Amino acid sequence: MAAAAVVAATVPAQSMGADGASSVHWFRKGLRLHDNPALLAAVRGARCVRCVYILDPWFAASSSVGINRWRFLLQSLEDLDTSLRKLNSRLFVVRGQPADVFPRLFKEWGVTRLTFEYDSEPFGKERDAAIMKMAKEAGVEVVTENSHTLYDLDRIIELNGQKPPLTYKRFQALISRMELPKKPAVAVSSQQMESCRAEIQENHDDTYGVPSLEELGFPTEGLGPAVWQGGETEALARLDKHLERKAWVANYERPRMNANSLLASPTGLSPYLRFGCLSCRLFYYRLWDLYKKVKRNSTPPLSLFGQLLWREFFYTAATNNPRFDRMEGNPICIQIPWDRNPEALAKWAEGKTGFPWIDAIMTQLRQEGWIHHLARHAVACFLTRGDLWVSWESGVRVFDELLLDADFSVNAGSWMWLSCSAFFQQFFHCYCPVGFGRRTDPSGDYIRRYLPKLKGFPSRYIYEPWNAPESVQKAAKCIIGVDYPRPIVNHAETSRLNIERMKQIYQQLSRYRGLCLLASVPSCVEDLSHPVAEPGSSQAGSISNTGPRALSSGPASPKRKLEAAEEPPGEELTKRARVTEMPTQEPASKDS
């Protein structure tokens, strides 16, 4: 399906009425009034417009999505309703499933036009095809518009010979041949809405109001205040703060990573882009305009939009792949024989691995719904190829539950990338769960913030408290193995073993042999041996915080040769020799 389309159903002339269409705009993502071309299409020539969000209470009660993400969504809906009130309209939150809800609404409201934002993800495309078929049978015109991505993803795939690009370099080459993204559409005005105002009943809030967390079955006792406030209003305020960083835009200054980088920033944007509270096109062109202003009309380089483009890259890779979030049946995923270790997975997810750096990150994620993109790299590497050798699919599910900005494409794509299962990552780079944190925050304040039981440890021992003398542990009132778990693995031994495992797997992928990927693989490389230069976009509003970045370690990598090579076809990637599993490293301790 094209990214923007009109499905012209056979609409009886009398149903349109002399005064125009009876429109319903269906909000899903795209929870905003700015740059919403599908909403403008609903208003155009209409006598009546209703804005609808369909929420299934049963799904809320049964899904694995965590409370922080539901709270962010409900806040975003409240904000949207508030904005619509200012236009003398309201948001209709309809309970149920789209396939059940729309036939009733079409009949009850006399709907003649349905509009919504195009969804590029496989599940969304399948759902929308069914709704469009239903609308056509009911004589309802359907209008869809693309505004969740910068580019027409189908066009990118077409330019690449009808297959998605599997390297970021190739993706950049393709979009450099395309026209610039469309400019953001103007926001709907009060004058436009006034001419097509729908009747609002006195009991609107009872029937169509935004539900509370309690109504959806979430216990809120002990729930802390939201670190990230949902909604378009907050998103636009954050965008303004983000763009105040003119020095970065002008000079490519990359602030060095430090403890403050790990905390939620008032300019962070990733959850707002995920829910569509902020338009990616508005952000793109605000950055573009600012760059031209401070650089005196110079054309911005693609790298200025790096985090946005990584998001686009993963959307392109996923759009025609319904198995993108799993190994089996996924044509781009290397079939690595991961271990089944539910105990290790649970300790990782609950922040009980015995490595304070990893546990603090997972605690922040569970409490706040967000972690810095390099923190994501650290915990993803630890779960998969670095230490626990657990499938990236398990990581996807945990992040999908806890992470505010998790979506199908970017979440799964990032996990495949970080676990070396796709997109040609350098498997011999390994994040040290002690050294990386210590270099980032030598004082250990981040650890003390999220693991207060360790706050009494001096900085010397806080990243590896198991090495602290007994007297230090007693003084800190935290005995390792009693009050805080011992390390779940011996990192030095396990990481070497896992690099060897990965080396075996890549050796069996004959496609790589001629590319010298294994020419000189050290037994273990602790990545990021120098302080990290943080991408400018991350703390100034981390766009797609899971987005990959160049890893800095040692001499030029053979990955460069790999990127220059022709991409392997999807069919060949499915023919993976399964490697005989090597003996699993015994956990150093089973303390919980």
Curated annotation (Swiss-Prot):
UniProtKB keywords: Biological rhythms, Chromophore, Cytoplasm, FAD, Flavoprotein, Isopeptide bond, Nucleotide-binding, Nucleus, Phosphoprotein, Photoreceptor protein, Receptor, Repressor, Sensory transduction, Transcription, Transcription regulation, Ubl conjugation
Summary of activators and inhibitors of this protein: KL001 (N-[3-(9H-carbazol-9-yl)-2-hydroxypropyl]-N-(2-furanylmethyl)-methanesulfonamide) binds to CRY1 and stabilizes it by inhibiting FBXL3- and ubiquitin-dependent degradation of CRY1 resulting in lengthening of the circadian periods. KL001-mediated CRY1 stabilization can inhibit glucagon-induced gluconeogenesis in primary hepatocytes.
Alphabetized GO MF terms: damaged DNA binding; FAD binding; kinase binding; nuclear receptor binding; phosphatase binding; photoreceptor activity; protein kinase binding; protein phosphatase inhibitor activity
Region (Required for inhibition of CLOCK-BMAL1-mediated transcription): 389-488
Region entry Disordered, spans: 532-592
Result after altering V396M: Reduced interaction with NR1I2 and NR1I3. Significant decrease in interaction with NR1I2 and NR1I3
Family per record: Belongs to the DNA photolyase class-1 family.
Protein name: Cryptochrome-2
Organism: Mus musculus (Mouse)
